[in-house]
Structure formats: structure tokens, C-alpha cells
Curated annotation (Swiss-Prot):
Identification of the protein by name: Large ribosomal subunit protein bL9
Gene Ontology biological-process annotations: translation
Keyword Lipid biosynthesis attributed: no
Family membership noted in the UniProt record: Belongs to the bacterial ribosomal protein bL9 family.
Species this protein is from: Salmonella arizonae (strain ATCC BAA-731 / CDC346-86 / RSK2980)
Function: Binds to the 23S rRNA.
């Protein structure tokens, strides 16, 4: 199925690209999320007429994401207290929701879907580096300090 991308999509293309994707991917993900429209003649003409407007909107979103990433990077360290055993192992774990709540409490709004934990959830006390994907091409980094209660 041919679609016109309205946003940058990882491993697919950027704004204005006409790409061929499977019908289910387009129908169930790209179109409902507003990332693409079917490439009909009407949509192609409509897109070409609004291309500059869409590019400006995309640039504004990218600028806002960069500003949020700077705020997140400015935090440097966020502390989370959790119950832990003698050897520093946590009772339970600290996941994306806990990290997002702690960063939000520190003053920067973050959704749990933006938190990236490459090594899985945090299960030990100490300092852990956590990445945030604020936008498809904007990343931020914070040190999470897990302390025992």
C-alpha cells in the first residue's frame, strides 16, 4: 500500500516520502497515529499544497523536543528511594513508570513511553544511566540514583 509520510518514521522515511508498506501497518498504525495518509491523487495534491506548513509544524515539534531534552539533561541526577535488602538488591524493581514519575516530580514532564531502559528494569541500588527518547531523533540522558529506604 502506498502512503505519504506526514512525520519522520524510523526505518521508513521522513516527511513527504511516498513509501510502500503493508496494508495492515498503514491501516492499524501509521494512519491512526497521524504519521501517514494513503497516497491517492487527492491526498498527493493536498499534501503538496500544505507541504511548507507541515514542514514548519514538524520543525516546531522538533524545537520543543530539543527544549525538553535540554531540561531533562539539566537535571543530571534524580534520586529514587526503594526498599532493598542487605546486599543492595531491591524488593521488586524500578520500571519506566517509577522513573517517569520521579523525573516529573523533579520538574520536567516525561511520559513513561519516553523512558528507555536498555538493560531492563532497575533491580539494584546505586547509580544507573537512563535514556529518554523525547522525539524520534532527540534523546536525553539522566543518572538515576537508587537508594535504600
Amino acid at each position: 500500500m502506498q502512503v505519504i509520510l506526514l512525520d519522520k518514521v524510523a526505518n521508513l522515511g521522513s516527511l513527504g516520502d511516498q513509501v510502500n508498506v503493508k496494508a495492515g501497518y498503514a491501516r492499524n498504525f501509521l494512519v491512526p497515529q497521524g504519521k501517514a495518509v494513503p497516497a491517492t491523487k487527492k491526498n498527493v495534491e493536498y499534501f503538496e499544497a500544505r507541504r511548507a506548513e507541515l514542514e514548519a509544524k514538524l520543525a516546531d515539534v522538533l524545537a520543543a523536543a530539543n527544549a525538553r531534552a535540554e531540561k531533562i539533561n539539566a537535571l543530571e541526577t534524580v534520586t529514587i528511594a526503594s526498599k532493598a535488602g542487605d546486599e543492595g538488591k531491591l524488593f521488586g524493581s524500578i520500571g519506566t513508570r517509577d522513573i517517569a514519575d520521579a523525573v516529573t516530580a523533579a520538574g520536567v514532564d516525561v511520559a513513561k513511553s519516553e523512558v528507555r531502559l536498555p538493560n531492563g528494569v532497575l533491580r539494584t541500588t546505586g547509580e544507573h544511566e537512563v535514556n529518554f527518547q523525547v522525539h524520534s531523533e532527540v534523546f536525553a540522558k539522566v543518572i538515576i540514583n537508587v537508594v535504600a529506604e
